[in-house]
């Protein structure tokens, strides 16, 4: 039996083709499996992300509706006329009187400042520069400073408790 060169070359090429195919499959099959695992992970995490987003959106909508309902209820309970009736009348008169005293002090101090171009600082009066003019402010007795002091004490107590 005589074998021709073409038959020998055929078997050599067949052997090379099969060996290269097996070698490449050793790399391709595990990497293909890893790729499949990662693709499955992406799909699963995408699904979980969508589920959590939808549930968070539902919770947000429910809480938003509940808060709107609570705020509407609270606004129906508070009436502008009722809050004025609850104000302590002597305290209100005292505050108005003190406010007019402060305004008169400010006018007097402002006029003397313009005339003398020099303002004396008392213990109760602090100067504030507004547009280049010194304006005295009574920081110890005004209603605004009382509010500011109450806010400062609240802030100080919060800092102290933390």
Curated annotation (Swiss-Prot):
Instruction: Tell me which parts of the chain lie in the Cytoplasmic compartment.
Output: 1, 48-162
What does the entry give for GO biological process? ascospore wall assembly; lipid droplet organization
**One Pfam family this chain carries?**
Osw5
> GO terms for molecular function, please?
protein-containing complex binding
Keywords assigned by UniProt, alphabetized:
Membrane, Sporulation, Transmembrane, Transmembrane helix
Where does this protein reside within or beyond the cell? Answer: Membrane
Q: According to its record, how does it sit in the membrane?
A: Multi-pass membrane protein
InterPro entries per record: Osw5
Extracellular topology: which positions?
23-26
GO CC, any one term = membrane
The record lists the membrane-crossing segments as 2-22, 27-47
The entry's family comment says: Belongs to the OSW5 family.
Free-text function comment from the UniProt entry: Involved in spore wall assembly.
Name of this chain's protein: Outer spore wall protein 5
Q: Please tell me the species this chain comes from.
A: Vanderwaltozyma polyspora (strain ATCC 22028 / DSM 70294 / BCRC 21397 / CBS 2163 / NBRC 10782 / NRRL Y-8283 / UCD 57-17)
